[in-house]
Amino acid sequence: MNTESCHCGLLSCKEVNTRDKDNKFTLQPLPYAENSLEPYISEKTVKFHYGKHLAAYIDNTNKLKAGTQFDDQPIHEIIKKASGGLFNNAAQVFNHYFYFEALHHSGAQAPRGKLSNLLEKNFGSFEDFKEKFTQAGTALFGSGWVWLVQEDDKLEIWPAPNAENPLKNGRYPLLTMDVWEHAYYLRSEEHTSELQS
């Protein structure tokens, strides 16, 4: 089993870069119970989102990288250097692992330490950051991601369409919000703004 690390925020990329004996990326088990995000995200949504969508992105990445210069590259290198379908699928693999890992570490606690200081310095307060982050997700036209990225001591909210990923632009991701429809469409009573807050 081949694993590599890129150390991006909460995610070490070990999960992203785990491969089988044929050098194919593999879907790793979700690091928590599928129902543990309820009532915010339903078990059905987690099963479909993680088990179907993420699995499809992994499968597509494996097919598209086979026999190319990217075949033995870690996911973060594919994201930085590839384009088209390979970039889109590899970025979605990273984006989804990062998203689900962040949900695993999330909770009712406000950030502490250096992150808390940086949020205050860049946004005024944690509450101000949450409001701006949520607004960025609501304002994003179509599907995509909203990222909290860091460059030195500067934090930035970076709305990104489609599969865009901050690694491609040399940014360090700290947090993401998935605003693709598959993140919430299975429960009609869920509305995007409820999930973003």
Predicted segments with their positions:
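Histidine-centered metal-binding segments
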Residues: 2-15
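An amphipathic alpha-helical core segment
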Residues: 135-189
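Divalent metal-coordination and catalytic microenvironments
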Residues: 27, 54, 93, 148, ...
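Alpha-helical scaffold segments that form or flank carboxylate-/histidine-based iron centers
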Residues: 39-55, 74-95, 162-165, 169-177
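Conserved small/polar residues in nucleotide/adenosyl-binding loops
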Residues: 190-197
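Acidic, low-complexity proline/glycine-rich segments
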Residues: 13-33
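Secretory/endomembrane lumenal or extracellular ectodomains immediately following the signal peptide
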Residues: 35-37
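All-alpha RGS (Regulator of G-protein Signaling) helical domain and cognate RGS-like helical scaffolds
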Residues: 63-71, 77-81, 85-95, 99-149
